[in-house]
Amino acid sequence: MKAIDINVKEKSYKISIKKGILSSIGERLKTTYQSRNIVVITDTNVEKFYMETLKNSLLESGFTMKIISIEPGEKSKNLATLERVYEKLCEFQIRRKDIIISLGGGVVGDLSGFAASTYLRGINYIQVPTSLLAQVDSSIGGKVAVDLPWGKNLVGSFYHPDAVFIDPDVLLSLNDKFFSDGMGEVIKYGFIKDKSILNLLDSCKDKDEVLQYIEDIIYKCCSIKKHLVEKDERDLGERMMLNFGHTLAHGIEKYYNYGKYSHGEAVAIGMTYMTNITERMDITKKGTHDYMKGILTKYGLPVNMPDMDKQALVNSIALDKKSSGDRINIIVIEEAGICKIMKIKLREVYGFLFPEDII
């Protein structure tokens, strides 16, 4: 088993990475909690594949278990779904010492974490991420949120789980689209902090070969996030590097109402578009844009900006959480494995993103 300890101001917790760990979660929890009441929040797709294994593990260890199952996808990450979760928690008479387990991808994790952070002013919760994207990124670091009609993750909090259990075996059931979705975030880590990730992905022929190294890949990504979260828990400085590609990605996702592009696909477009701009400005080393396009394309990710309303995209960026006063922080790549934070005035964002439109 690979383990990573996260140490932040409010608490410390462990990320445990092991094939087959899903079947032993009950055993691992029974000596930690006095309460034997658990609510598992999941989605209807994940429930079909993995609930039975988790359920057996919990029941065999003496826990009682209730299930809250939501519809899969970003469209469920809203206040209406959150209210239904609260309603179920009340119906199940969940108390502060009881436990929420988030079993699912990024949407389930964000929604479950925010519910746990606010219900009874905070109850225990555990992350069991089942998508590659959630395993390398969203299950770690304490950011939990729901979307509003005006943008992504606009209502949220910082609330760390008590533990994160990552079972790479669950990735074997991912279809190619969801695998590629997670690879968008994996490739991001390579470009912002660790070129060895890119070298490994370059050397692999296909998805099956990547899965042979997946524990090491997950460990590398989680270690990078641990370092940045511990240095900057509240996302006010260096942690913003994790948002490379995300400023554009969130705008793209919202523009298409979370239907056309997955999060990882939108991040891939955002990274590629931004790197093309900064390479032309001589901020980024020549050849980086083509290198990025090649590795993203290899893993089934889009690299071309869709034909969309440019002003609508810029307007959504103004609501981005990385904006401060009249400026926004944008993450740019200097070369593969090295990035920096640039500050741009909000009134200059359109010209920065679409210089060909400025005469």
Curated annotation (Swiss-Prot):
EC code(s) of this entry: 4.2.3.4
HAMAP family given in the database record: DHQ_synthase (MF_00110)
Q: Which organism is it from?
A: Clostridium kluyveri (strain ATCC 8527 / DSM 555 / NBRC 12016 / NCIMB 10680 / K1)
Name of protein: 3-dehydroquinate synthase
Q: What class of enzyme is it?
A: lyase
Give me the reactions it catalyses: 7-phospho-2-dehydro-3-deoxy-D-arabino-heptonate = 3-dehydroquinate + phosphate
* Segments crossing the lipid bilayer: none
The biological process GO terms on file are: amino acid biosynthetic process; aromatic amino acid family biosynthetic process; chorismate biosynthetic process
Query: Per the similarity annotation, which family is this?
Result: Belongs to the sugar phosphate cyclases superfamily. Dehydroquinate synthase family.
Principal localisation: cytoplasm
* Record's subcellular location: Cytoplasm
